Amino acid sequence: MRIILVILSFVLLSSHQVVAEKAPNENLYNDALLTIFSRKLYPQSEQPDYKLIYDTLITTLFFSIDKEIINYYGYPKQFESAKILGITREHEGSFDFNAEVQVTTFEHAHDPHYGKETMTFNISPFGVKTTSFQHEGDKLEQDINEFYKATLSDIKQSFNLNLESYPSYTYNQLQYQAEINNEFKSLFNIAEEIVSSILLPERKIPNKNVIDPVTFIKDNTGYILFKKSDGTNVNYKVQKKDGNWIVTEKNSKQGKKMDYKIPWYVWKKIKPTD
């Protein structure tokens, strides 16, 4: 999943016109780009044109952008429509710059919900460092977050669970952790089986009323929570034994049946919240 999303995002960036929000300062873009690659400066006649400088700078920042999106969402997301909003020089004559970049993230085949991610990178001869990250979601994102929050609240109340001290992972977050950390693979396999055998057959187009499993783990114990389309709340208690996660207990109780409000392709909530 990780490699595919990186390739898709890079293709999307290359197929969309990259634009600046403000009038360009070619010298700043040129100096910022040269700072990344070399301390050596070249005569003006040998410097590339502005469009090449701009596109090269965006390409150079690609993996820094991708890293910050993963840090925020907890898993890779595709993005497009990159914009450099502006570049400033830290000090007159220095090769230390702040570049403000904005991209649009999306969930499935260019469909909503959309996120607007604005990042500021400090570019110096020592490398690229992120200094700020701001996220702005659309109305659908807000609706999905509220749906997930209401669903999880109903499940927790059914089983009288207080999980504030437990780190949580949505389905895609858990999948990403399994890709980069072998200790999560057996845990993700449990969640994947829930989705494929229980939740996927209940999914309807264009909207569904179920959420994918949300996993809460602390040390070697945890819970996997989900709700069926008829409102049944389900709680899997899991435990790590000999390096593998196993289900030690399954419980279910009738809960609130949710309305069909979530687009069928949404596989997780946007940002983890308790």
What is each stretch, according to the model?
Residues S15-N98, Q102, Y148-G231, S252-D274:
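Flexible low-complexity loop/turn motifs enriched in small/helix-breaking residues
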